[in-house]
């Protein structure tokens, strides 16, 4: 998933806030299981939607004619004034979605059914290599004379509101990308009761869609994955070609752009092309860790050699819904590794802390256009949130699944699941099994009770709400039990806060704060705020949601990498300098201060100057003793502003790696 937020800043760099809960760019993981490989003969596919913590997701129902014929929808995610727009040629179809709660940044409807039996799951973010982008760049607003191309923020809304089946959806996207361009690279899935298509959008105008075979499975985190394809010319449409076997729909210049970029792996004369080799960017370690663990989830004997992974995989295992649920929770156990959510390196798991929701579609053998299947949805992290069956024609979800609050709220499935996860992270070994055991027991029962045949809208709504309420009660039980054990844990045990930074705070990666037992009644994180002046800034202790911690009972031990700051460095609690020493290439100091200013410089008087500059911080600290509530601050906007300055034009937020 990608998200783009454009902001007018002025001197907003001074407001930059980057916390230890850094945003994850490029982190979604998709999966497709062909019907020949499943235990019940169904087709299964879905995705984890990953970006960041404290980002609410809700289930929605959009009624027929929400958008009238002749009415336009506009994408504001990249440029509010010059974004992609689509004008409906007919009133929009009724559709469901799993949506963001900040429409001012874009629709991001992500996944859903429509009344015609179409299913859309969009998108897994990816990016092409620099060579092909130099030939056919993304239509991302860099050229201000052209409207921005289509993005993840609006594509699902346009497709579900407009298209009747999977083939038509692919053709619609092909036409839009060919004529209006794409602002970003993406992988996506559209399906109906008869067929499933997987599509990759590579550059500003190049794409390939493949009708998915029934005897394969695929795992696709953030990259392009289609390997060698035979793109023959069967039928030539105005904006795309259809292969002679009907298996591919592709852009007319798919060979030419790669050839002009000198990246073509293949032969245009024989119509063979290795799309991964020709168009994909470098494979990231965090992508490799997820594709390897994901493949082994369904093919335990899989082995890997090099960085090329066949998109179409075989297995002798008969795969179940439970297996796919487990896939969304995979934390590299099958690779005998311990996952690391923060570094986003080779230990980054599918089941990471940045998952905002996960959805799995189950298309049974009995599927029809009127009743194409079931969506299993876990709002919040599936590590703590049970999957619940949602039906194509239901009219509403439970209020807790539709609660659009952007602050912590116990009457929200998303927020309750994430609050539970935050506590688990302090003692995963002991606390995660509590959630896992209860969730597995519930889901096993729910899978048995799910209905895969036609129901009335009233019946479907009632069944979903009954199951969703039961899942919510289970989540509340998990939250209550873990909260009690968590509070006992931080009261009776020391723990260490580990900081992992990004961009401006990347040099601070490896910073730690050692917290003695019973130091505070809340779990704490380290937040770093670089100031506009180079080499200065603040260290702040915050709770799960970025709210400042007002005091601690014990002295904490801070350890800051010396490589993060150059020259003479001083740390201050208000006006008072904190004595520090260098140990193992870290500045180490002890203090009860929860807000610390730092100043790096070579001048002898730098420490004195910093003390004067920090007097304002003392005043603020005195005034800031109000009780901290569980509330999401405006840190998302501040981060967006800071990264906008760094990028000079805009900040691009991308889902799950």
Named regions from a protein language model:
Residues 502-508, 512, 521, 549-550, ...:
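Proteolytic cleavage junctions
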Residues 337-460:
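Substrate-recognition/cap regions that form aromatic- and gly/pro-loop-enriched pockets
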Residues 643-657:
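C-terminal membrane-anchoring or membrane-association module
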Residues 432-501:
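Histidine-centered catalytic/metal-binding microenvironments
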Residues 28-151, 172-301, 306-309, 314:
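A contiguous strand-loop segment
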Residues 502-503, 529-570:
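Proteolytic processing hotspots in large secreted/extracellular or virion-associated proteins
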Residues 15-25:
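C-terminal segment of classical bacterial N-terminal signal peptides
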Residues 1, 13, 502-509, 513-516, ...:
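Intrinsically disordered, low-complexity repeat and linker tracts
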